[in-house]
């Protein structure tokens, strides 16, 4: 038997594909899903298969996080390819089987160095790690007024000179580029990439994020080809009953895929639920905006921090060193802040992985089917990868997560190989 003929039978689990399938058996052949069905498992038919008993467990597609700045102690902007392997593995063991590594505003030299590292990993999958689908360029072409924690020094209007340099450095692996469409030639930039996305740019997606656009400017950008919103609500104009902005354009235009950070800190759950109510589960993708802290146990990060009781937060010395910055980084309520307690305090990013985000959304009253859809199939569709990933169906990549009743991952499979396995066979 060759490795490509290897068979694995996952039997007796409650399957959400992401739609509920009841108790089903899933047969894996090589790196693909061979079949899924509710009929009794016939051991004689798959005598050569490795049998995994998923009774009393839940089986879902591998989660897809499209906004990941780091994890496992590594930050996309400041790490080489070797260090970013830790990020891929930290997310994988938590059931996140595909990630888009996100790069913040910085010098072109630093951005291109990061894009090269991500491009290498996109073309050379990490053993035991989440599949890196490509990179997400965020903040470089954003608004100075809505920069959030982006480095103000390096923000500039969208331009083709920088973009083509980034595209070359990435080896054609940039999946998403976020812009403030109101800046200079934002519309022309968007139209060009949207027009030639499939032909010349491997289906790159143009998003609006860190934007101070008016409603009319945002609508014009959507008409020009923007199809995605970078972490909706955070770093964007709007949320006013008279002076409408980007947020209202996202709500009222069905073609926009709206990312939403689901740590409960970046966005109040009431607004997150309102967004989902308006756009539906097929229009909203769950993301984390995770930093280097994601996937690290409290015991580990607490060793690199100092508790400050006045702020009820932990100051992270190692994050400060990792980022090469004179800013102070704090963990508070599962989010990372800069300069907490000062006038310029800002949210820096998240420290959860998407599996924790999934549990949050379920705790907000959504069914598991709804939450899983927003963490799997919806993001896969937004990247035009739903023919490969995002659901449990014959012919698709065998990216699966087996959960216990509390939605903790007991086993994780990426393209037919277990990267975590705590179940009996």
Labelled PLM ranges:
Residues 54-114, 245:
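Metal-associated gating/positioning segment near the N- to mid-region
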């Amino acid at each position: 038997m060759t490795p490509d003929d290897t068979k694995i039978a996952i039997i007796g689990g409650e399957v959400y594909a992401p739609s509920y399938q009841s108790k089903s058996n899933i047969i894996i052949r090589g790196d693909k899903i061979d079949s899924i069905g509710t009929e009794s498992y016939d051991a004689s038919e798959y005598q050569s298969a490795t049998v995994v008993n998923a009774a009393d467990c839940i089986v879902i597609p591998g989660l897809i996080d499209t906004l990941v700045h780091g994890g496992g102690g590594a930050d996309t902007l400041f790490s080489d390819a070797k260090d970013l392997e830790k990020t891929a593995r930290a997310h994988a063991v938590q059931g996140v089987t595909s990630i888009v590594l996100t790069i913040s505003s910085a010098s072109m030299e630093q951005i291109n160095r990061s894009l090269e590292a991500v491009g290498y990993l996109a073309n050379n999958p990490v053993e035991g790690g989440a599949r890196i689908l490509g990179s997400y360029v965020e903040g470089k072409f954003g608004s100075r007024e809505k920069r959030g924690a982006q480095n103000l020094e390096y923000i500039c209007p969208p331009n083709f000179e920088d973009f083509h340099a980034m595209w070359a450095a990435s080896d054609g692996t940039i999946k998403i580029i976020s812009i403030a469409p109101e800046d200079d030639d934002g519309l022309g930039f968007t139209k060009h990439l949207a027009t030639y996305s499939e032909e010349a740019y491997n289906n790159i997606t143009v998003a609006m994020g860190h934007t101070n656009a008016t409603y009319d400017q945002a609508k014009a950008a959507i008409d020009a080809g923007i199809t995605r919103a970078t972490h909706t609500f955070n770093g964007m104009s709007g949320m006013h009953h008279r002076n409408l902005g980007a947020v209202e354009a996202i709500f009222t235009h069905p073609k926009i895929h709206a990312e939403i950070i689901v740590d409960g800190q970046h966005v109040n759950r009431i607004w997150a639920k309102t967004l989902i109510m308006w756009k539906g589960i097929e229009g909203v993708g769950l993301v984390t905006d995770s930093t280097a802290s994601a996937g690290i146990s409290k015991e580990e990060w607490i060793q690199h921090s100092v508790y400050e009781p006045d702020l009820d937060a932990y100051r992270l010395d190692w994050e400060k060193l990792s980022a090469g910055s004179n800013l102070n980084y704090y963990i508070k309520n599962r989010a990372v802040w800069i300069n907490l307690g000062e006038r310029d305090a800002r949210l820096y990013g998240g420290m959860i992985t998407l599996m924790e985000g999934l549990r949050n959304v379920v705790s907000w009253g959504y069914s598991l089917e709804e939450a899983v859809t927003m963490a799997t199939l919806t993001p896969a569709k937004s990247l035009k990868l739903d023919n490969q990933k995002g659901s449990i169906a014959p012919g698709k990549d065998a990216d699966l997560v087996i959960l216990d009743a509390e939605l903790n991952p007991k086993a994780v499979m990426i393209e037919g190989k277990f990267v975590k396995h705590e179940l009996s066979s």
